[in-house]
């Protein structure tokens, strides 16, 4: 029942709207307008302090038949940069790309458009369906700020399982595991002295930092854990023993205990190096989001797999090395599976999206909304 031409036209329209993280207001207004044109009630949620945006989250509930568990759908309105002045084109090969030196914006306007098309299709064809709550978030790319802000208004959310439409890979891909993510920020303060005349009177912050890093387990720590140094910064004259070095690193793990062990290990290395050199250490650990892991035999996954198969699409489960709004929703106690929607080469000017994947994503949402074979959408 999906209108394929309308779906594509809406995608072309939406990606032309600038909505880099923090500047989603115009995109919020457009989606809100399109949903209200269907007679739907739309709630604005989240303040600028929590969402880090000049826009807001949008919540829209499409009431369905009683007695069937509701389904939550989620997609984010923001994009990464360069995402201003996007000119989408559909190639003869059926693949959508950006004409200019920008991203395409399929991440995540593919998911946004598919959700809006579901609302329109249910309006056009009022068949029995389960209650579906549409959640459009802001600030996902910059830190899942919009999704995290939902926690303050938890009562606005339906009680059910969720589908997040924000994974690379084809329709049929179900991300059921993703890591938690923590950032370690540190400043090492040494003591300046003349590098030629009084080198032993100084304490090199650079040398201290390098010794700490050399002692760290980095890269692929184990099958569930990774760690990386993003910044090791020190600027100064060559004739001065460097007194200040900045250190920023991350750790990710699908295991909560392993994530803590890795960040503890990294800070222990910093402490030991500073103790040895006599430098001072100031550090903080910021936990950006928690990981999640859904059992492969969960009834919700079996239901989703059945829907995909009924469409002639082969379902498969996967793990992700990055985070999404699914992390935030799972942390709130809402089981959320992140679905592949077809986007490839995301976060780059080579981003692509096959039109057939956009269409199949919208078709899947239609089937999920009207599917009443199980009650496994209940959490």
Which ranges hold each PLM region?
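Zn-dependent metallopeptidase/amidohydrolase metal-coordination segment
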Residues: 7, 232, 243, 313-375
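Active-site metal-coordination/substrate-binding segment of hydrolases
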Residues: 54, 61-63, 67-136, 153, ...
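A non-catalytic alpha/beta surface segment that caps or lines the substrate-entry region
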Residues: 20-67
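Acidic/histidine-rich catalytic neighborhood of metal-dependent amide-processing enzymes
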Residues: 100-179, 221, 226-231, 237-239, ...
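Glycine/charged-rich beta-loop-alpha catalytic/anionic-binding loops adjacent to active sites
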Residues: 90-103, 187-193, 311, 343-347
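Acidic-enriched catalytic cores of C-N bond-cleaving enzymes acting on peptides and small amides
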Residues: 198-233, 240, 257-280
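N-terminal capping segment at the start of a domain
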Residues: 1-25, 287, 344-348
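A short beta-alpha structural unit
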Residues: 12-16, 228-235, 250-254, 280-301, ...
């Amino acid at each position: 029942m999906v209108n394929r031409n309308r779906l594509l036209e809406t995608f072309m329209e939406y990606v032309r709207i600038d909505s880099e993280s923090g500047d989603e207001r115009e995109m919020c207004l457009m989606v809100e307008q399109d949903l209200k044109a269907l007679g739907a009630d739309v709630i604005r949620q989240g303040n600028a302090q929590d969402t880090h945006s000049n826009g807001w989250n949008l919540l829209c509930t499409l009431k369905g038949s009683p007695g069937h568990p509701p389904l939550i759908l989620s997609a984010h309105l923001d994009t990464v940069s360069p995402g201003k002045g996007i000119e989408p084109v559909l190639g003869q090969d059926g693949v959508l790309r950006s004409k200019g030196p920008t991203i395409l914006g399929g991440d995540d306007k593919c998911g946004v458009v598919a959700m809006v098309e579901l609302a329109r299709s249910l309006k056009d064809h009022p068949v029995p369906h389960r209650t579906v709550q549409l959640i459009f978030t802001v600030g996902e790319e910059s830190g899942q700020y919009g999704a995290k802000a939902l926690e303050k208004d938890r009562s606005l959310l339906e009680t059910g399982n969720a589908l997040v439409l924000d994974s690379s890979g084809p329709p049929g891909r179900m991300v059921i595991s993703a890591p938690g993510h923590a950032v370690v920020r540190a400043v090492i303060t040494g003591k300046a002295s003349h590098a030629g005349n009084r080198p032993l009177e100084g304490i090199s912050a650079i040398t201290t930092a390098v010794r700490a890093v050399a002692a760290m387990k980095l890269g692929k720590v184990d099958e569930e854990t990774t760690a990386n140094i993003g910044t090791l910064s020190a600027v100064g004259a060559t004739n001065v023993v460097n007194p200040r070095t900045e250190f920023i690193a991350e750790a990710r793990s699908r295991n909560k205990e392993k994530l803590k062990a890795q960040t503890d290990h990294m800070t222990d290395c910093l402490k030991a190096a500073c103790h040895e050199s006599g430098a001072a250490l100031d550090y903080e650990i910021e936990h950006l989001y928690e990981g999640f892991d859904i059992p492969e035999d969960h009834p919700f996954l079996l239901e989703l797999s059945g829907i995909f198969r009924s469409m002639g699409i082969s379902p498969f489960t996967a793990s992700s090395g990055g985070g999404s709004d699914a992390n935030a929703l799972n942390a709130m106690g809402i089981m959320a599976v992140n679905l592949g929607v077809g986007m490839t080469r995301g976060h780059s000017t080579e981003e692509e999206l096959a039109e057939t994947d956009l269409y199949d994503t919208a078709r899947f949402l239609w089937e999920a909304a009207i599917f009443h074979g199980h009650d496994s959408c209940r959490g």
